């Protein structure tokens, strides 16, 4: 029988760590999976990759394999190794082959090492109003179950009731320990990560911890000043508009923005001047009177100047 070069099969170096080997294995397993690959030798390559992974993924077996490979050109080793000629060779036979060549003193009892499960990440949409207080949320997600080749064999649906804390922000990650995929050989489960996505709001834009709302004003409200009703996340308030307000001007409403553990933002009302519909004869005359009274005013006086 032939002692295969498992590192060459996996396209890795003997000095590579388990993470690198695992990445290579998953890539090759997907590439040569008989249900996916169109290559004529895909099934044979797939089995070869799986065989290499089963040995190299286990610390004890990998150490034994490295010792076998180191002695592969030793004549005495070859005589003993050839005794296994013709027998099927897989990872389970590996322990027996090693023992028959080196004896029981050359190896330790075989143990599979515990491995941590995979983390799962899901997006959770939250409305702006929901960020004001802690609230309960029922979430559903799927836990993948991997086969011996590292491919997803099936998915198990799971439902959890979770608490979304007050003051969450867009992109914030919330960890639910142990709610990911199960660990292997007694290893700990992976975690579930909730990634918060603040849903777009029809009125408010988010700027860090602050909020912005467009405030439509009639020209005379901006010119003369007024008290207008403005929406916030909790209720409507009366906002005083100072005389001579300009389009684009931001009026600060303190403490009406987004809250976090350390800071509460502000709400900014951004003024937008809204003209009335096409004026009738009477209204046009009034506009003309205003124009005559302000004939010296040129809004484009500084326009285009450095």
Swiss-Prot record:
Protein name, per record: Curved DNA-binding protein
Subcellular location per the Swiss-Prot or TrEMBL entry: Cytoplasm, Nucleoid
NCBIfam families attached to this UniProt entry: PRK10266.1
PANTHER family: DNAJ HOMOLOG 1, MITOCHONDRIAL-RELATED
Lineage summary: Bacteria, Pseudomonadati, Pseudomonadota, Gammaproteobacteria, Enterobacterales
Biological process (GO), any one: protein refolding
Cross-referenced HAMAP family: CbpA (MF_01154)
UniProt function note: DNA-binding protein that preferentially recognizes a curved DNA sequence. It is probably a functional analog of DnaJ; displays overlapping activities with DnaJ, but functions under different conditions, probably acting as a molecular chaperone in an adaptive response to environmental stresses other than heat shock. Lacks autonomous chaperone activity; binds native substrates and targets them for recognition by DnaK. Its activity is inhibited by the binding of CbpM.
Keywords from the UniProt entry: Chaperone, Cytoplasm, DNA-binding
